Amino acid sequence: MARYRCCRSRSRCRRRRRRCHRRRRRCSRRRRRRVCCRRYTVIRCRRR
């Protein structure tokens, strides 16, 4: 399964050449982050 990460803005996602998609179900249940649900998520994003 692909890892999803929060993206604050589309521009940031574009910089990393990643695609941002709006997904509500992709919000991790353990980390209840509304940002992930409301904002954009990056597919195949590496963790820092």
From Swiss-Prot:
It comes from the Eukaryota. Testis. Keywords: Chromosome, Developmental protein, Differentiation, DNA condensation, DNA-binding, Nucleosome core, Nucleus, Spermatogenesis. GO terms for biological process: chromosome condensation; sperm DNA condensation. Pfam families: Protamine_P1. It comes from Murina cyclotis. GO terms for cellular component: nucleosome; nucleus. Protamines substitute for histones in the chromatin of sperm during the haploid phase of spermatogenesis. They compact sperm DNA into a highly condensed, stable and inactive complex. This is Sperm protamine P1. Its main location: nucleus. The lineage of its organism: Eukaryota, Metazoa, Chordata, Craniata, Vertebrata. GO terms for molecular function: DNA binding. Belongs to the protamine P1 family. It is found in: Nucleus; Chromosome.
